[in-house]
Amino acid sequence: MKKNTLIVIAGLFFLMAWTTASAERYVPDQHPTGIVNWGNGKAYFFSGGQYIRYDIASDKADPGYPKNINAETWPGVIWMDGIDAVVNWGNGKAYFFKGGQYIRYDIKADKADPGYPK
């Protein structure tokens, strides 16, 4: 049986390919709404109110995932039901988008910057 290949481009300069069979093991409902390369060997896949942390070098999800988006896992990201998109801007900041709003996230501090969403 021939396997389909899914190619995902997200974040800055991030390209990943895998068979759909392997993608099903990692992405909560197989329809990610946000995918971002965090720049530290990890990528995050968001789907609905959940996300997984993916280890690029080992080509697999980290143990214990998926997890829910909440105040403990993503401080300051208020959209517990999910996001529309996310991008690592390459300057230590990531941007989460939902509807017409966005949140700037400080990657090093691991929390949203004050004054968001905008």
Regions found by a protein language model. Give the residues of each.
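Bacterial N-terminal signal peptides that target proteins for export
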Residues: M1-V8
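Bacterial N-terminal signal peptides
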Residues: V8-A17
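Bacterial Sec-dependent N-terminal signal peptides
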Residues: M16-E24
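Disulfide-stabilized extracellular ectodomains of secreted/luminal proteins, especially beta-rich
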Residues: A23-K118
